[in-house]
Curated annotation (Swiss-Prot):
HAMAP family named in the record: Ribosomal_uS9_B (MF_00532_B)
Keywords: Ribonucleoprotein, Ribosomal protein
An annotated GO cellular component: cytosolic small ribosomal subunit
Protein name: Small ribosomal subunit protein uS9
Gene name of the encoded protein: rpsI
Organism: Bordetella petrii (strain ATCC BAA-461 / DSM 12804 / CCUG 43448)
Amino acid sequence: MIGNWNYGTGRRKTSVARVFIKKGSGKIIVNGKPVDEFFARETGRMIVRQPLELTGHLESFDIKVNVHGGGETGQAGAVRHGITRALIDYDADLKPALSQAGFVTRDAREVERKKVGFRKARRRKQFSKR
């Protein structure tokens, strides 16, 4: 993908998205499918389009995304992060607006591991006094 493509990598939880954008008609293709087909829930589609709506480029770019790992919400967040980075690669003047909205910052929250002797990450076994 050489030429007039701009690239951004996005991450969220265990999902990783590789995003390529170029001037076009506003098509968003995720893993070979249209975004409306790939993300079944409306919230996922909304999350993906947020940086484009904020910058006013909703119909300006053709976007190709390769995303893997995690679940639907994590993948949507990773795609949003990747689109944000690709937009900054395209035009650095967009960074303050995107940063103000909180799209540039990588959400560092990850699932806490389960500990030995506990039921879950923090849930202990029930204590019996007698």
